[in-house]
């Protein structure tokens, strides 16, 4: 029998494991701290990964922040339990580790700093002295790993209830409910829970009144309609003026990152849809691309264009809901009902292509679930003919309304410096005049082949500017869809690669070896090489990213999900202090967030 199968394992992988020693920042660090001050880790993240000593963390961070082309944004910060990791060749000894992902806008480059920690000494200095947005990330890392950040202003739980015992992302913490004892709510425990819910301003970092003044404390949420989900903000008021406020999150926390450790690389795809439940396939994109980096898969051109098309459909769908609900929050009801008619047309198109509506789980490792159906182009053509006129009517009837402008212009305004300090991305960042959209700055899935513009504001990001940028982004998405319609490549909808999951069906019907592979990959899951990968995308609400660690298994060793809404809610107090409660409602409507994206 002649073997017609191609030996794809001998081909050049799509993503090389690199140490990035040629990146200028490595030379700058060595010149300042010496060649032996740190260990460079080779990964498939696409960015330099540098292990540094705990004692040098703040000095290195300050150095990077003050370079001629500085690393001005703390993009992400979290931890990892290294105790069960078997593939750690060449890395410093560590029971746990903390990573710091920094971005330089001027260089359009990133760097990841890592600090190794021993189990009996889980202490690291707080990064809040350099980047204020480290606050929530450090709280979450302590909450889920038990790593203490010395000097943190308010190191308390953020995802889990204050009475929770243990740190869920540790490897010795159960991942399934069946591993716990049955839940019992005794009278003593109920009293303890009620006591924990008692509001004490000093525990939230708020000051009580003095003899000459007193403040009112107001709960907004967690079930207020303008909170856009299970979200609570405690307001400290002097009359109608907001003196201070503290966002309270975690009500929607589902342990999505923990789930990644017990699902196969393939079976985790449906969970990605639900991280930001309005984004659909946009959420699948960074995860699938990160897994494909681990696997070394290059997908066909047709797959790239199909993925872009589905992503832009969901971007329009999300933006329509955002724009119409913002108008509703300001006080106009009608547009939200019209917008749902438009969104229904998108859902009909998505359902015709994928078989599902909100959460298709349609992208696959190495491709998409199936090819485009007959008639997809007609449905897309009808939508492209329909939408521009509708968008123009929303803008004319509502967004140019003088009352809406008066309620939103100049409200919750901030500049580029503040946006970068708080890790703001998406329209909130671009409204400050910074032209940074991942689709243009760091193209993925073939975005470099599309002709579209990035709307940018004039220097100040206020509620009105953020909304109007989203309107223009919607128009640009329509341009991209037009190009997808007119230039859809021919070819397969899956890559011809051993780790494509499920494998191309044609081979399973011809070769028993491929049928065996199909059985193993669908039942146990594909085995990804031990490595680390990272992928960021321009999601509907800002930059979303997946940082995956494989230990050579069928499941992820560590799945880190960085979402834009988390960073944007942390910024609320800095942007709204001194404003009125009514302004806060407008501000919340202008952020564009859903709590599943925040709490994961």
Curated annotation (Swiss-Prot):
Residues 214-600 are annotated as: NADH dehydrogenase I subunit D. It is found in: Cell inner membrane. It catalyses: a quinone + NADH + 5 H(+)(in) = a quinol + NAD(+) + 4 H(+)(out). Keywords: Cell inner membrane, Cell membrane, Membrane, Multifunctional enzyme, NAD, Quinone, Translocase, Transport, Ubiquinone. InterPro entries: NADH_DH_suC, NADH_DH_suCD, NADH_Q_OxRdtase_suD, NADH_quin_OxRdtase_su_C/D-like, NADH_UbQ_OxRdtase_30kDa_su, NADH_UbQ_OxRdtase_49kDa_CS, NADH_UbQ_OxRdtase_CS, NDH1_su_D/H. The keyword Kinase does not apply. Signal peptide: none annotated. Coiled coil: none annotated. GO terms for cellular component: NADH dehydrogenase complex; plasma membrane. GO terms for molecular function: NAD binding; NADH dehydrogenase (ubiquinone) activity; NADH:ubiquinone reductase (non-electrogenic) activity; quinone binding. Pfam families: Complex1_30kDa, Complex1_49kDa. Its main location: membrane. It comes from the Bacteria. The keyword Cell inner membrane applies. It is a peripheral membrane protein. It is an enzyme of class 7 (translocase). Its EC number is 7.1.1.-. Residues 1-190 are annotated as: NADH dehydrogenase I subunit C. In the N-terminal section; belongs to the complex I 30 kDa subunit family. NDH-1 is composed of 13 different subunits. Subunits NuoB, CD, E, F, and G constitute the peripheral sector of the complex. NDH-1 shuttles electrons from NADH, via FMN and iron-sulfur (Fe-S) centers, to quinones in the respiratory chain. The immediate electron acceptor for the enzyme in this species is believed to be ubiquinone. Couples the redox reaction to proton translocation (for every two electrons transferred, four hydrogen ions are translocated across the cytoplasmic membrane), and thus conserves the redox energy in a proton gradient. This is NADH-quinone oxidoreductase subunit C/D. The lineage of its organism: Bacteria, Pseudomonadati, Pseudomonadota, Gammaproteobacteria, Enterobacterales.
